[in-house]
Amino acid sequence: MALEKDEKTAIITDYQIHSSDTGSPQVQVALLTERINGLIEHLKVHPHDHHSRRGLLKLVGRRRRLLAYLASKDKDAYRKLIDSLGLRR
């Protein structure tokens, strides 16, 4: 469920805007999406793990807020991010 350091570094490198960017909305959404996908796989194996399900819902809400912020600030970056991550919005 937690991302390994090399996985996290690879995601940051793929979505960063400049060389020292680690906190832009694009990077945050990409990291959250990876964590969400990991939790979804965990819940397929352990469907009664309600604590993890609550954590998943919190992560989805945080990602939704970040995507709404990005959509209001930069539509082109929003659309590019949605396409690259394969999200349905």
Curated annotation (Swiss-Prot):
A GO BP annotation: translation
Instruction: Please tell me whether the keyword Cytoplasm is annotated for this protein.
Output: no
Cross-referenced InterPro entries, in alphabetical order? Ribosomal_uS15, Ribosomal_uS15_bac-type, uS15_NS1_RNA-bd_sf
Q: Which GO terms describe its cellular component?
A: cytosolic small ribosomal subunit
Q: Which CDD domains match?
A: Ribosomal_S15p_S13e
General function of this protein = One of the primary rRNA binding proteins, it binds directly to 16S rRNA where it helps nucleate assembly of the platform of the 30S subunit by binding and bridging several RNA helices of the 16S rRNA.
What's the protein here called?
A: Small ribosomal subunit protein uS15
